[in-house]
Regions:
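N-terminal secretory signal peptides and thylakoid transit peptides that target proteins
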Residues: 2-22
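Acidic/polar helix N-cap motif
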Residues: 10, 77, 96-97
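N-terminal Rossmann-like dinucleotide-binding module
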Residues: 18-88
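Beta-loop-alpha module in the N-terminal Rossmann-like domain of NAD(P)-dependent dehydrogenases
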Residues: 53, 91-149
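Solvent-exposed, polar/charged alpha-helical surfaces in well-ordered, non-transmembrane soluble domains
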Residues: 57, 61, 79-82, 86, ...
Length: 153
């Protein structure tokens, strides 16, 4: 009996795509005015990726696939992230997220964080303090102290 190879997506891919879609369309656009730009429902979000070498690159790709603008990419390892940098030739490149937020602060509506776990809270807090919306891989924080600091940001 021959089994033909299916081109359909599996459950994991569907849930991942649905999760990213829900996060970006229900969290960011509804309140994407705090960062300096006023958005209408027809405007595309200007999103920056922080930590794009592996999983973060996949997250940025999902956001780009939803039609949003990828305006900046940041990764400390330019060689490892070169493949992702090449996918978005119009996005500005950075190796320090703080410099990126300083230079492009008013142009960025939200950030996608795909850095190592222990850096999530610090980067998310800095982005939130600057009025940016955050999509972050889990865990967002490692302690109650970090969670409280994020809530205050």
């Amino acid at each position: 009996m021959n089994k033909s190879k299916s081109n359909s997506i599996n459950r994991r891919q569907f849930l991942y795509g649905a999760g990213v879609g829900v996060a970006m369309f229900s969290i960011l656009p509804g309140c994407a005015t705090r960062g300096g730009r006023r958005l209408s429902q027809n405007d595309k979000l200007n999103v920056a990726g922080i930590g794009i070498g592996s999983r973060g690159g996949a997250d940025v790709g999902e956001v780009a696939g939803l039609g949003e603008n990828i305006v900046a990419l940041c990764d400390v390892d330019e060689n490892y992230a070169a493949k992702e940098f090449a996918k978005y030739p119009n996005a500005r490149r950075f190796t320090d997220y703080r410099v990126m937020l300083d230079k492009l602060g008013k142009e960025i509506d939200g950030v996608v964080i795909g850095t190592p776990d222990h850096t999530h809270a610090v980067i998310a807090m800095e982005a939130m303090r600057r009025g940016k919306h955050v999509y972050c891989e889990k865990p967002l924080a490692h302690s109650v102290h970090e969670v409280r600091a994020l809530m205050a940001a």
